[in-house]
Amino acid sequence: MQGHRIGYVRVSSFDQNPERQLEQTQVSKVFTDKASGKDTQRPQLEALLSFVREGDTVVVHSMDRLARNLDDLRRLVQKLTQRGVRIEFLKEGLVFTGEDSPMANLMLSVMGAFAEFERALIRERQREGITLAKQRGAYRGRKKALSDEQAATLRQRATAGEPKAQLAREFNISRETLYQYLRTDD
């Protein structure tokens, strides 16, 4: 049964270009998530899983766009192939179907493990770079949401009993950020 070719794209940040991932690839529909790959509860991934039918092919730029770790990758590939859906990874040049051979399963495990390893290396280099930049005084972290004066006012008003949700709205910060300011004194 010949089905549709459906694309799945995931970008981690809003400044990444989702079109780049499936350029020069023919697909009839594309599902795009702007979310971290560590979370498998992504709205467009869920929509894709509901949309695909037996005979369809899901096209993904690379394994790390579908999942960040090997367990999630294997689970998603298995969920799709058990329903008669093929999955094609362009960067790795691999296609998985429901009739996968032991060699195909090995390739999925090896390539998925490499993607996971690559992600771990990137994070390690990022942490090392931040540490070195901090030592040089070049890295200050993210800009604070509130000035010191605003933070002091926020703490005073919260201590006086004003509703925290109201304060968060008024200071244009999330409640989590508000609680972080209340936990610290700097």
UniProtKB/Swiss-Prot annotation:
GO terms for biological process: DNA integration. Transmembrane segments: none annotated. Residues 4-137 form the Resolvase/invertase-type recombinase catalytic domain. PROSITE patterns: RECOMBINASES_1 (PS00397), RECOMBINASES_2 (PS00398), RECOMBINASES_3 (PS51736). Residues 17-38 are annotated as: Disordered. Keywords: DNA integration, DNA recombination, DNA-binding, Plasmid, Transposable element. One of its GO terms (molecular function) is DNA binding. Signal peptide: none annotated. The active site is at residue 12. InterPro entries: Homeodomain-like_sf, Recombinase_CS, Resolv_N, Resolvase-like_N_sf, Resolvase_HTH_dom, SSR_resolvase. Residues 164-183 bind DNA. Resolvase catalyzes the resolution (a site-specific recombination) of the cointegrated replicon to yield the final transposition products. Belongs to the site-specific recombinase resolvase family. This is Transposon Tn501 resolvase. It comes from Pseudomonas aeruginosa.
